[in-house]
Amino acid sequence: MSDLLKVQDLHMWIQTDKGLNHILQGVQLDIQPGEIHGLIGESGCGKTMMTKATLNLIDPKRTVIRGHIEFDGQELGKLPEKERRKIGGSRIGYITQDPLTALNPLYTVGEQIAEMLRYHKGMKKKEAAEEAARQLERVGIKPGAEMAKRYPHQFSGGQLQRICIAMAVCCEPKLLFADEPTTALDVTTQAQILDLLKSLQKNGLAILLITHDFGVVSEICERVSVMEKGIIVEEGLTDEIFQNPQKAYTKRLIDSAVRKEGAYE
């Protein structure tokens, strides 16, 4: 099976007041169609920056990138910027860590999902509004037509995360980047969001789950890549990594999950 996403020797430098900071140091990562792949590491290790490099969500004036990123057979670095940005949202969905930062407080959630559909799918206003309501129901926000008229502040944290998932998958992407989607949620809501992601995978969606918590990885990820200081230090099947971690850093991450009550068995 050919890889859906293939990252090879990816380097990133960010300009700071003290000079160039080498954020990503030769990252190697591949994601297969329809799999849930975990990318785990401590905060600040470069997980989010890798996804932003893939989606071109960076400041070119302050950032230098080297390496190869291939998605669905296309070398992203060779695409015009406009075409590459269109891939984000239509063929690659993205859920940020904080749903409030992804939603505009001045517009209803239905309007924001509909805008995605109009931009990427070319839908007319009425058609997009109806599809937005359907997408809300798809992620458990019901009744969709009524909820679509509400503003972000009228929803709970768990509901907002569901809405962000609806926005990320409304254009039927092949790949979803889920960046710490459960971090700010209680245990019950966290389990519901993970179940939702698993249900989306059953429809053929590949997911890169970005987290610092091995307990979350153990719940839904088939494979996992461990990142330390901008480098993938270990990669393999989740069960094998749990049972026989090769790196001390990986073992510390697993031990921290074990110490959390009920993290995994």
Features from the language model and the residues they span:
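Conserved ABC transporter NBD signature motif
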Residues: 63-75
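A short, proline-enriched helix->beta-strand linker immediately N-terminal to the Walker B motif
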Residues: 170-174
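Helical segment within the ABC ATPase nucleotide-binding domain
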Residues: 191-203
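A short, surface-exposed alpha-helical micro-motif characterized by mixed small hydrophobic
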Residues: 217-219
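ABC ATPase "signature
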Residues: 235-236, 244
